[in-house]
Every structure is written in structure tokens, then in C-alpha cells.
UniProtKB/Swiss-Prot annotation:
Transmembrane segments: none annotated. Coiled coil: none annotated. This is Putative N-acetylmannosamine-6-phosphate 2-epimerase. Signal peptide: none annotated. It comes from Klebsiella pneumoniae subsp. pneumoniae (strain ATCC 700721 / MGH 78578). Pfam families: NanE. It catalyses: an N-acyl-D-glucosamine 6-phosphate = an N-acyl-D-mannosamine 6-phosphate. One of its GO terms (molecular function) is N-acylglucosamine-6-phosphate 2-epimerase activity. It is an enzyme of class 5 (isomerase). Belongs to the NanE family.
Amino acid sequence: MSLLAQLDQRIRHHGGLIVSCQPVPGSPLDNPAIVAAMALAAEQAGAVALRIEGLANLQAVRPLVTVPVIGLIKRDLPDSPVRITPWLEDIDALAQGGADIIAIDGTQRQRPASVSALLAEIHQLGKVAMADCSSLDDALECWQLGAEIVGTTLSGYTAEETPDEPDLALVQCLSVAGCRVIAEGRYNTPAQAAEAMRCGAWAVTVGSAITRLEHICGWYNTALKAAVCPANEQ
């Protein structure tokens, strides 16, 4: 049975939650052993797959879990805004590290390696390709180029301002177009994730709301401060 067929079964039985275990850089949680523990806990809690950034984290996670792992490497390049798995060498490293699915930036931006070249390298190594996209045009082009999965990962993150809500409209458009789409980006409540599935998502990736303690505390602190400020002003 193919990896995607196996994932289809997991999604039908468990509901389609993918957990992204990517701590805030520099956080006390930003440690491969802690990332591996989070990943194992997520699997035990019913995650159908995991999204792991960085080779050290991938190598720590892979021996502990049985669910598929989406691997990526983030880089800050001086001559390109593309951050997610920009180099062909990154794909080779992720494949050797045990990633089942390799995620790349699928946007139409200046980059060191073309999307088509990255997809070809992923397939040459026998892995499944996921394209992290920002728009309908991005995703449809990546789908036509052979990406088995397209994600709404970068929707709202390539412009100056990032919206608060997830891009459910993009999920629905991609589903109608026949794409296998993973909803990702600002799915901070179970209700939002469920709505993405109703819009046609194949699965939903949740990161900050599960594995980024600083973000979760920030949401609560903002709400609590807003609640007490009127009382303090009286």
C-alpha cells in the first residue's frame, strides 16, 4: 500500500490532524529531544502525521514514531525570500534523515532552485512531495508539476500584513479543483480545523496552537489584559 493510501486510512479513522512540532527559535523548547517528545505525544494523541523542521529534529523524531513525517529545512537566504527547503541538497538531507514527505516552498518567487527541479529531486529519491503555497495560482501550478500534496501554508505570509483567520476560501477552491490539499496556517481552534475539513481539506496541520507555548500564553495574556484593563482604569 502506498504512503498516501496509508494516510487516507489514517485520516478516515482518526480525523486528519497533522501536528507541526516547530518550537519558537531560541525557545527553551527548541531542542531535538524536546521536539521528539512532543512528536511522540502527538502521535499517541491521534495525529495522523507530523511536520518536522530541521535535520537534527528529524533525526531525533524518526526513530520514535511510526506515523509519516513531513520534513522541511528552513533557511534565511540573502538573495531570496524563499525559506522552506530552498536547495536541492536540503532534499537529499531530508530523504536520508527519514522524511516520508518533503515540503518545499511552492510560491512563484525568486529562488535558488526551481519548483520543478525540487519536485523532480524529491521523486527521484522516492519521496512524496508537498508544495507549501500562498495562492490558488501557486498551488495549481505545483499540482500540475506533480506535487502530490499542496498546502495553504504560506497564504497570508507573503504580503506585508498577515490576517488573523485561516484561508478557508483557498482550501475550498483547491478542493474543487481536485487537489489533495492540506489546510495549514492560523488554524488555532478545533472549530477552524473542522471547518477546513468541511471545505474539502484532505487533512489539517496545526502548529502554534499545540506546540508553541509562547504563542498560546500570548493569546491568553492578551485576552486577560484586555479583561482587566477596564477595571484598572476605574
